[in-house]
Amino acid sequence: MTPIVKQFKYGQHTVTLETGAIARQATAAVMASMDDTTVFVSVVAKKEVKEGQDFFPLTVNYQERTYAAGRIPGGFFKREGRPSENETLIARLIDRPIRPLFPEGFFNEIQIVATVVSVNPQISPDLVAMIGASAALSLSGVPFNGPIGAARVGFINDQFVLNPTITEQKQSRLDLVVAGTDKAVLMVESEADILSEEQMLAAVVFGHQQQQIVIENIKEFVKEAGKPRWDWQPAEANTALINQVKALAETRIGDAYRITEKQARYEQIDAIKADVIAQLTAQDETISEGAIIDIITALESSVVRGRILAGEPRIDGRTVDTVRALNICTGVLPRTHGSAIFTRGETQALAVATLGTERDAQIIDELTGEKSDRFLFHYNFPPYSVGETGMIGSPKRREIGHGRLAKRGVLAVMPSAEEFPYVVRVVSEITESNGSSSMASVCGASLALMDAGVPIKATVAGIAMGLVKEDEKFVVLSDILGDEDHLGDMDFKVAGTRKGITALQMDIKIEGITPEIMHIALNQAKGARMHILNVMEQALPAPRADLSDFAPRIHTMKIDPKKIKDVIGKGGAVIRSLTEETGTSIDIDDDGTVKIAATDNNAAKMVMSRIEEIVAEVEVNAIYTGKVSRVVDFGAFVTILGGKEGLVHISQITDARVERVSDYLSVGQEVNVKVVEIDRQNRIRLTMKDLDNNLSTNVTPEAVVQEESTEN
């Protein structure tokens, strides 16, 4: 059980790969570490293909264990449950660059499980998990055309930084993860603080160059510990069947792909498939329907790609750099805080913005502790958006991933908490989809935020680019359709403002994408983005000056932090009383910032006035109106300035002799008092003498006579 270990320097960090001691029944397993952040990655690959399997069943599970950070999970059950949003996103991050590296026709089931078992608060586990997965797959012997490397690139003080720490990332204007082989970039995921196309491309190239050391060391690791390569060969092509399907379907498929309307085109393609299947299976019952459909799909790809490379119009008749027709409506929902419908061709998003208070912020429980998120973005992709029926329930991996990409696109222009003290939630409902619904969500979100009066720094638009490449010939496509995404070689999404890029996501299905191609794609995307921004700015040039009548107004005031306890009161009594009386929501920060949320301005002003009274300093000789809070034998306690108690001694109630305080004062009675003294213990002495209090005694004349006769 002697482990095989490979260790190397990667930028400022040390990476360790270890295998052979743990999970020996798995096909391959690697313990990957980077400066005490450790992820255990296992790969299990089935030797046999499941009967009837016609797709590649690759599953990636990423899971974080709280023991990695020396913590016990919260909640009733005290154990980890379903994957968090962050775990889902990292699982997708691992999946995307490795999936294209398996050969076409490989249908053996593979499961990758990455478990975070130790975490250094300065090192994010996502990169470690990607490196570990690459190493484990390379060791396993499966037909994987890797290994891949992975790098995170930051941009601090106008310099690229390789694999910045968590602390360094807070100062960075860029968070970019790039993965690829020794020859080509395969995946990019990033958010940026409005960087230029040239800066983004340079960051991708920098990250790809730097990760070569990872690839080299994994190759050396495989030489030492790798399993024999599987003797896998793709199934032989059924040339006779291919020719039969071509004869029956090729011309008809070409005609179908001249139908510009999606549903009509799909109906025609489905009819062709049904007809060809019926004809061929009638001749030979042993022919598989799946095999026929695969050949037809390949014909569809050949037709679409061939026409594009030949310079012919695209599926819907557009040129390569034309954006589909745009339609924008804002303020479409009467009772919401902000709303917009953004339509691009047959893709449509209904975006809705909602404003809330600090207590609406999302509390995220991460390995390193809790953090609060003030900007929430949720993306929903219902089945009706593509004319289908299906399950409606919790969000799927794709919805979580698209929502995060759209959020990244808008995040750079969001105002700070000081500029706009609201928690903001955007929901994008995809009501129609035919390509790039995530970028439609970016556009819709930008418009909905402006409709809600959120002072975003600039309008943001997003565009999806595609690529068709054969040998040295390639064509970059702007605003791709769903079919072009499916049949093309690249999905390249760019969001940004007029000044630069805020988010970039790239998934490449082939090797050989050069920096030149990426440069052309970025510049072509910029032109498309400017066109969309022109149309958006015509519809809504700037954020609305006023918030919706239905949105809460947040009024901010500052108090001495030492006075916070007075505003809250014992057991929260004072602040609870204020909120219940006025129907407002009150949040107090540790620095003494008080935020009052109210739909009624008068209620907010009342709360502010009451808080000013509570925190005001009591002044000697000042006269206040207060309420009697307690009556005792030696006097009465009166509450002034919203919560401070002072004593009116029995001798200070009136000039006349007072036998019983209760004869003159009762709890809840409003009286005028003057501050006589504040002693060293901050006790307040009050007097009611010489003040207009209109005191009426509760003593009856008979009682007075009786007392006098008793004295005699």
Curated annotation (Swiss-Prot):
Pfam families for the chain: KH_1, PNPase, RNase_PH, RNase_PH_C, S1
Record keywords: Cytoplasm, Magnesium, Metal-binding, Nucleotidyltransferase, RNA-binding, Transferase
InterPro entries: ExoRNase_PH_dom1, ExoRNase_PH_dom2, ExoRNase_PH_dom2_sf, KH_dom, KH_dom_type_1, KH_dom_type_1_sf, NA-bd_OB-fold, PNPase
Main location: cytoplasm
One example GO MF annotation: RNA binding
Compartment list: Cytoplasm
Cofactor(s) in the UniProt record: Mg(2+)
Domain KH: 552-611
The reaction(s) this protein catalyses: RNA(n+1) + phosphate = RNA(n) + a ribonucleoside 5'-diphosphate
GO annotation terms (biological process): mRNA catabolic process; RNA processing
Boundaries of every S1 motif domain copy: 621-689
Family matches, as PANTHER family: POLYRIBONUCLEOTIDE NUCLEOTIDYLTRANSFERASE, POLYRIBONUCLEOTIDE NUCLEOTIDYLTRANSFERASE 1, MITOCHONDRIAL
Function according to Swiss-Prot or TrEMBL: Involved in mRNA degradation. Catalyzes the phosphorolysis of single-stranded polyribonucleotides processively in the 3'- to 5'-direction.
The protein's name in its UniProt record: Polyribonucleotide nucleotidyltransferase
Record organism: Haemophilus ducreyi (strain 35000HP / ATCC 700724)
